From Swiss-Prot:
Protein purpose: Responsible for the deacetylation of lysine residues on the N-terminal part of the core histones (H2A, H2B, H3 and H4). Histone deacetylation gives a tag for epigenetic repression and plays an important role in transcriptional regulation, cell cycle progression and developmental events. Histone deacetylases act via the formation of large multiprotein complexes. Involved in muscle maturation by repressing transcription of myocyte enhancer MEF2C. During muscle differentiation, it shuttles into the cytoplasm, allowing the expression of myocyte enhancer factors.
Protein name: Histone deacetylase 5
Originating organism: Mus musculus (Mouse)
Annotated segments matching region Disordered: 1-22, 39-63, 187-272, 472-494, 526-611, 1088-1113
GO annotations of cellular component type: axonal growth cone; chromatin; cytoplasm; cytosol; histone deacetylase complex; nuclear body; nucleus; RNA polymerase II transcription repressor complex
């Protein structure tokens, strides 16, 4: 019925109407304009012969023509229906877009509301915190005001008190002591003798006793003031002169003593009191009495039994030593008394009464041998200027890492005999032993750290002379010059002077103790074999640290006798000899200082200079043997023979007692097996809170591993290597000088370093207060100011020693049981339990000192070794491969993306197998073995390293929770990974313990790795593991790694297709591939043989042709 024109018109409308359904949903505007457009698609059944629906124009044109009304009505209804459907569709689209925009705006509004609420909460919290702080400050101010008012009221009450009231109320114990003492003294008859009347007469009890323990009266006055100085008259007298005793007997009159003390302080014109007969000795010049004789005349100057006379700093040369002999103080100028009042040697010593001047530091000397050291007190000078100067010096000492001395050393006491440093030649050895006994008892009571004073420094007490031979070993008593040589010495107000004196005595005590320890070790060490290589000495190592190492060594040696030829016994003797060298070097330094001044005694210098010169020459020759060639047994300092412990019987050693370097060269011998290094010194790095449960990285980690190796018998198959502390120069191969001094020094050795270099690190050292009460670099990296620096240096040194022996061919491989870990430590940053990067430092030193060409570092700790990657990111000679949990940067430390492949010339030498996908499912044995099969081993074999270092962190072993692990690798798997790495670098593999905090897990993994290193047969993997396929997340990770690394290592490309295979399928495929290659090789060899036979048949061989010239089969 429709005309062709109508059909054409409909077809022409179809493209314009067909645009609407293809419009994207998001491109429809919010306000849609609905136009009355008729649909362009009509049912095919509505048309006539044309098969199309007429357009509105055609319909309007068709109205003029004749048409069936029913059909026309039906057509209009269809068009209206289609139009309604189109409009309904447009409404739905409009509503959908509206709903989408509404949801979007709703979410934005919710986010804005949450952000606003969060800001309001933060503001409220800050306001609350500020209010609490203000309230606390107001409370503190109120408390201070109340305290101030209370003190003012007390002061007002004291000022307005009546004279009849008591100044102080003595305790019941003091009252009883005084009463018993007075009763006992009142019953005793007063002797009239001159020689020994002082200790028995009640008038002189104050000068004979010096504490409440000896029934002395209570000390009045505020703390810190000098003790009262009694005025004993040293001759017979009557009861009219007994005024002080009667006054001090009654309690209300105790304040009289303070008045007497004030009078004594004001009357400073003369150190000698007037005698009753009017005889006066030079009241205008303060001069000391010179003692020109010895023997009884000297000991009788103080008019008392030996050890009981009074003394003062101005006349301390007359101090009676503990055994009655005269001690000398080289810091007090000594002059003759005026000529009109010279003191004859045979005169009665009770003519003079001496007292101490309160203007100087007062030390009570001349104690009896039975009196404890607490009876001698060091008091501060009441002068304000002297006190300020001492405070300034103490603060400066603290800034430099020293300790407080003098009046700042808490409330402890210093023996009075410490000032008597220079003993005369005829002094009894018993006096010297008792002097050491006093020093030992004094140092044992110190709550603070040991006094750290440079032993090589010049003593401030001896400015006119250099350090005497008191620095010798204890074999000889020190000799000093007479008192006439010390006229230019300063007064002893300086705390550094007392420090130097104490340190000299401590040094002598240390040497004596060391000789005894060496003699005890002699019986064990004489049965050992050759000496091992001697580690490098460290000038900054202190005697305290060496003593601790020796004590630990004695504890081990007493339990087990080392087998013959073991490195444990060799290194023991080696350490003792190293300490001897350090002591003699210190003595040598002191002697050279004296020679520069030209005042050394003629009988002291030559023998010491001769012995030290010979000893120095011996080690100068030995140091020429230090350069080592790679993979050859090194010539160490141990090749220089020593007369082992025999030298310690006499000190200093004479040149004749030492053998020449060429007499009996000793060859270093090691069992060619696995080396293990461990040192108990690393156990001292721990938090000051002492609670290991809140600190995952604690000393029990390496203790447990060491015990496991002993229990299983693996340790007996290994060669134990003696560790050492790494030097600061070695640490600076990777870390900055600032970082090295910051964490590589402690108050024990900081004094021997340059103070200018230490000024920055020490002043800017910042610590964080941990919730446990200790301190740390951050919230988890704890720090111990006394021991952490030595422990972290010991960890580095142990690994360096072990790696050097493996690289030089002395050992087959090695396992370092060290802590704290190091692979997180960057050039100037400590983090993640790490301070110094042990593995990176070892790799650098192997290249610098042993000329190792290429080093492979494999890090299978679950955390990425950001410090190691940073150290070698641009170095093509070190290949770093890390397998770690990455999770797209959401796992600590957040670095180690697969795209990090190196920089500059080191592009391609940094490989990160960064596991992603979390712990659902956790990465296990299959994934690690697949990574080794497809990525690690192919790249490592193509790199062909000379030495392999492994950062063996075991926190991927099952048993570690998600924050510190979360994976389920078995300990057995790490043994198989170690066995694969042993096929590289000729087996020169060294494992260093890194992370791992579950004790059972790390012990099992360490046992498996050491078993693999010892070539012990490992337990086979479970069949389920061999049949299991890697997880989807692991396959995706390995595919990405291969895609990135195939640009630099073509060997990994062929493994991309088999990543989803199980280990059993991969082994089968590799076996078939190997058989195919072998068959092809056999076919080619057979063809060559046939060709060679045919050639031989056609050209006979001459008879004289040698066999070597036959064609190779």
């Amino acid at each position: 019925m429709n005309s062709p024109n109508e059909s054409d018109g409909m077809s022409g409308r179809e493209p314009s109407l067909g645009i609407l359904p293809r419009t994207p949903l998001h491109s429809i505007p919010v306000a849609v304009e609905v136009k009355p457009v008729l649909p362009g698609a009509m049912p095919s059944s509505m048309g006539g012969g044309g098969g199309g629906s007429p357009s509105p124009v055609e319909l309007r044109g068709a109205l003029a023509g004749p048409m069936d009304p029913a059909l026309r009505e039906q057509q209009l209804q269809q068009e209206l229906l289609v139009l309604k459907q189109q409009q309904q569709l447009q409404k739905q689209l409009l509503f959908a877009e509206f709903q989408k925009q509404h949801d979007h705006l709703t979410r934005q509004h919710e986010v804005q509301l949450q952000k606003h609420l969060k800001q309001q909460q933060e503001m409220l919290a800050a306001k609350r915190q500020q209010e609490l702080e203000q309230q606390r400050q107001r409370e503190q101010q109120r408390q201070e005001e109340l305290e101030k008012q209370r003190l003012e009221q007390q002061l007002l009450i004291l000022r307005n008190k009546e004279k009849s009231k008591e100044s102080a109320i003595a305790s019941t114990e003091v009252k009883l002591r005084l009463q018993e003492f007075l009763l006992s003294k009142s019953k005793e008859p007063t002797p009239g003798g001159l020689n020994h009347s002082l200790p028995q007469h009640p008038k002189c009890w104050g000068a004979h006793h010096a504490s409440l323990d000896q029934s002395s009266p209570p000390q009045s006055g505020p703390p810190g003031t000098p003790p009262s100085y009694k005025l004993p008259l040293l001759g017979p007298y009557d009861s009219r002169d007994d005024f002080p005793l009667r006054k001090t007997a009654s309690e209300p009159n105790l304040k009289v003593r303070s008045r007497l003390k004030q009078k004594v302080a004001e009357r400073r014109s003369s150190p000698l009191l007037r005698r009753k007969d009017g005889t006066v000795i030079s009241t205008f010049k303060k001069r000391a009495v010179e003692i020109t004789g010895t023997g009884p005349g000297v000991s009788s100057v103080c008019n008392s039994a030996p050890g009981s006379g009074p003394s003062s700093p101005n006349s301390s040369h007359s101090t009676i030593a503990e055994n009655g002999f005269t001690g000398s103080v080289p810091n007090i100028p000594t002059e003759m008394i005026p000529q009109h009042r010279a003191l004859p040697l045979d005169s009665s010593p009770n003519q003079f009464s001496l007292y101490t001047s309160p203007s100087l530091p007062n030390i009570s000397l001349g104690l009896q041998a039975t009196v404890t050291v607490t009876n001698s007190h060091l008091t501060a000078s009441p002068k304000l200027s002297t006190q300020q100067e001492a405070e300034r010096q103490a603060l400066q000492s603290l800034r430099q890492g020293g300790t407080l001395t003098g009046k700042f050393m808490s409330t402890s006491s210093i023996p009075g005999c410490l000032l008597g440093v220079a003993l005369e030649g005829d002094t009894s050895p018993h006096g010297h032993a008792s002097l050491l006994q006093h020093v030992c008892s004094w140092t044992g009571r110190q709550q603070s750290t040991l006094i750290a004073v440079p032993l090589h420094g010049q003593s401030p007490l001896v400015t006119g002379e250099r350090v005497a031979t008191s620095m010798r070993t204890v074999g000889k008593l020190p000799r000093h010059r007479p008192l006439s040589r010390t006229q230019s010495s300063p007064l002893p107000q300086s705390p550094q002077a007392l420090q130097q004196l104490v340190m000299q005595q401590q040094h002598q005590q240390f040497l004596e103790k060391q000789k005894q320890q060496q003699m005890q070790l002699g019986k064990i060490l004489t049965k050992t074999g050759e000496l091992s290589r001697q580690p490098t000495t460290h000038p900054e190592e202190t005697e305290e640290e060496l003593t601790e190492q020796q004590e630990a060594l004695l504890g081990e040696g007493a339990l087990t006798i080392p087998r013959e030829g073991s490195t444990e016994s060799e290194s023991t003797q080696e350490d003792l000899e190293e300490e001897e060298e350090e002591e003699e070097e210190e003595e040598e330094d002191c002697i050279q200082v004296k020679d520069e001044d030209g005042e050394s005694g003629p009988d002291e210098g030559p023998d010491l200079e001769e012995s030290s010169a010979g000893y120095k020459k011996l080690f100068a020759d030995a140091q020429q043997l230090q350069p080592l060639q790679v993979y050859q047994a090194p010539l160490s300092l141990a090749t220089v023979p020593h007369q082992a412990l025999g030298r310690t019987q006499s000190s200093p050693a004479a040149p004749g007692s030492m053998k020449s370097p060429t007499d009996q060269p000793t060859v270093v011998k090691h069992l060619f097996t696995t080396g293990v290094v461990y040192d108990t010194f690393m156990l001292k790095h721990q938090c000051m809170c002492g609670n290991t449960h809140v600190h995952p990285e604690h000393a029990g980690r390496i203790q447990s591993i060491w015990s496991r190796l002993q229990e299983t018998g693996l340790l007996g198959k290994c060669e134990r290597i003696r560790g050492r502390k790494a030097t600061l120069d070695e640490i600076q191969t990777v870390h900055s000088e600032y970082h090295t001094l910051l964490y590589g020094t402690s108050p024990l050795n900081r004094q021997k370093l340059d103070s200018k270099k230490l000024l920055g690190p020490i002043s800017q050292k910042m610590y964080a207060m941990l919730p446990c009460g200790g301190i740390g670099v951050d919230s988890d990296t704890v720090w111990n100011e006394m021991h952490s620096s030595s422990a972290v240096r010991m960890a580095v040194g142990c690994l360096v020693e072990l790696a050097f022996k493996v690289a030089a061919g002395e050992l087959k491989n090695g396992f370092a049981i060290i802590r704290p870990p190091g692979h997180h430590a960057e050039e100037s940053t400590a983090m993640g339990f790490c301070f110094f990067n042990s593995v990176a430092i070892t790799a650098k030193l192997l290249q610098q000192k042993l000329s190792v060409g290429k080093v492979l570092i494999v890090d299978w700790d679950i955390h990425h070794g950001n410090g190691t990657q940073q150290a070698f990111y641009n170095d093509p000679s070190v290949l770093y491969i890390s397998l770690h949990r990455y999770d797209n940067g959401n796992f600590f430390p957040g670095s180690g993306a697969p795209e990090e492949v190196g920089g500059g010339p080191g592009v391609g030498y940094n490989v990160n197998v960064a596991w992603t996908g979390g712990v659902d499912p956790p990465i296990g044995d299959v994934e690690y073995l697949t990574a080794f099969r497809t990525v690690v081993m192919p790249i490592a074999q193509e790199f062909s390293p000379d030495v392999v270092l492994v950062s063996a962190g075991f926190d991927a072993v099952e048993g570690h929770l998600s924050p510190l692990g979360g994976y389920s690798v078995t300990a057995r798997c790490f043994g198989h990974l170690t066995r694969q790495l042993m096929t590289l670098a000729g087996g020169r593999v060294v494992l260093a313990l890194e992370g791992g905090h579950d004790l059972t897990a790390i012990c099992d993994a360490s046992e498996a790795c050491v078993s693999a290193l010892l070539s012990v047969e490992l337990q086979p993997l479970d069949e389920a593991v061999l049949q299991q396929k890697p997880s989807v997340n692991a396959v995706a990770t390995l595919e990405k790694v291969i895609e990135i690394q195939s640009k630099h290592w073509s060997c990994v490309q062929r493994f991309a297709a088999g990543l989803g295979c199980s280990l059993r399928e991969a082994q089968t495929g590799e076996k078939e591939e190997a058989e195919t290659v072998s068959a092809m090789a056999l076919l080619s060899v057979g063809a060559e043989q046939a060709q060679a036979v045919a050639t031989q048949e056609h050209s006979p061989r001459p008879a004289e042709e040698p066999m070597e010239q036959e064609p190779a089969l």
